[in-house]
Amino acid sequence: MSHEGQEELLDYSDSEEIAVPTTTAPSAAAGEGANDKEADKKGSYVGIHATGFRDFLLKPELLRAIGDCGFEHPSEVQQVCIPQSILGTDVLCQAKSGLGKTAVFVLSTLQQLDPVPGEISTLVICHTRELAYQIRNEYARFSKYMPDVKTEVFYGGTPITRDLEKLKNKDTCPHIVVATPGRLHALVTEKSIRLNNIKSFVIDECDKVLEAVDMRRDVQDIFRNTPHQKQVMMFSATLSQEIRPVCKKFMQNPLEIYVDDEAKLTLHGLQQYYIKLDEKEKNRKLSDLLDSLEFNQVIIFVRSTQRANELNKLLCSSNFPSIAVHSGLPQEERIERYKSFKEFNKRICVSTDVFGRGIDIERINLAINYDLPNEADQYLHRVGRAGRFGTKGLAVSLVSTKDDEEVLEKIQSRFDVKITEFPEEGVDPSTYMNT
């Protein structure tokens, strides 16, 4: 496995299993309008429980940062996971996109962190550079009142010498490392990173990281270079029965949290439709949708980097200013485009599945499957970009082949959801736009 330029990123017991029932509640921080700067400051989680974050007895610095983000009450996942995770319990958590899984490990690791110059205490592994970048930003905003805490992100496609410079200097060596498997494995192999003080070992989107044999081997090598006594936490929106035992081999008596286990695709407020048409009709239909539908930001999923580039060029030439993000771009360009879209410089993004997992951009409220994914689980990750926790959203899938029809059937069967045909009269904006 290459240690640089990773494109698709990212032996040890019985467990306690908890199934958390799904609960819905009105949004505590309703989504803002497209041009409302307040959206950058306010969180989008819904208050599920009466319990507030203060009841977790978190550090005052963390509570202050949480307040600045606009979060008042923990989500159901946070309510169950945080009290156990801050005690050092191993955690395996599966919950739908947008339920605040990232905040669980960010807050719990910061709560337990006692920064020592030159010592890495927390290691977070994820499968793409964009997700690593996003997790680093989450650490930055929750540790804003903890000035001694340093976080760095390491991923392939950038000069490894920059990583080495940061790691060998005690003043710049981070306490928290967020990394993709290939680059991290390269640093471990070259003995350029010291993991002997790791207290928290986290894998986000763990199924994606551990399903591929070569990636799993890299993670196992990294894991063996950490202390035996440490906390291990793994999170994903989808955890098949087959991958769970693999995850648990890294853990000791983990607390297992399965929210809506193998169950309904009930992303609160998400409207889902399909449109049957010929392949050659897709471009015209897409133009019609972008013309007729109201949206803050839209993400359009395609199956390949070539199709992403071609569709992006077509949209721009048709007066739909868009941006394309995919694994075929040079590393710096890819990150810059991701940042540009997140900062609302463009309202339309054409992407491959590199944006299909974990990426959280609050203003996205429309997801279009120009090409349907090959697997039902990937559909969940894609449409989860719209209608993030506590907000409304709309998902439209273009169905043009027999294979597409089979995938659509699998999605409805897998998640016990009814995806209806897009109505001729269109969709009422009030059903998917936040007021």
Curated annotation (Swiss-Prot):
Catalytic reactions of this protein: ATP + H2O = ADP + phosphate + H(+)
CDD domains cross-referenced by the UniProt entry: DEADc_DDX39 (cd17950), SF2_C_DEAD (cd18787)
InterPro entries with a match to the protein in the record: DEAD/DEAH_box_helicase_dom (IPR011545), Helicase_ATP-bd (IPR014001), Helicase_C-like (IPR001650), P-loop_NTPase (IPR027417), RNA_helicase_DEAD_Q_motif (IPR014014)
Placement of sequence motif Q motif: 51-79
Gene that encodes the chain: SUB2
Entry similarity comment: Belongs to the DEAD box helicase family. DECD subfamily.
Helicase ATP-binding domain residues: 82-257
Compositional bias ranges of the Acidic residues kind: 7-17
Function: ATP-binding RNA helicase involved in transcription elongation and required for the export of mRNA out of the nucleus. SUB2 also plays a role in pre-mRNA splicing and spliceosome assembly. May be involved in rDNA and telomeric silencing, and maintenance of genome integrity.
GO terms of biological process kind: mRNA 3'-end processing; mRNA export from nucleus; mRNA splicing, via spliceosome; subtelomeric heterochromatin formation; transcription elongation by RNA polymerase II; transcription-coupled nucleotide-excision repair
Main location: nucleus
Gene Ontology CC terms, in alphabetical order: chromosome, telomeric region; spliceosomal complex; transcription export complex
Enzyme superclass (EC): hydrolase
Limits of the Helicase C-terminal domain: 269-430
EC numbers, comma separated: 3.6.4.13
Region feature (Disordered): 1-40
Top-level taxon in the UniProt lineage: Eukaryota
Keyword terms, alphabetized: ATP-binding, Helicase, Hydrolase, mRNA processing, mRNA splicing, mRNA transport, Nucleotide-binding, Nucleus, RNA-binding, Spliceosome, Transport
Protein name: ATP-dependent RNA helicase SUB2
Molecular function as annotated in GO: ATP binding; ATP hydrolysis activity; RNA binding; RNA helicase activity
Domain characteristics, as noted in the entry: The Q motif is unique to and characteristic of the DEAD box family of RNA helicases and controls ATP binding and hydrolysis.
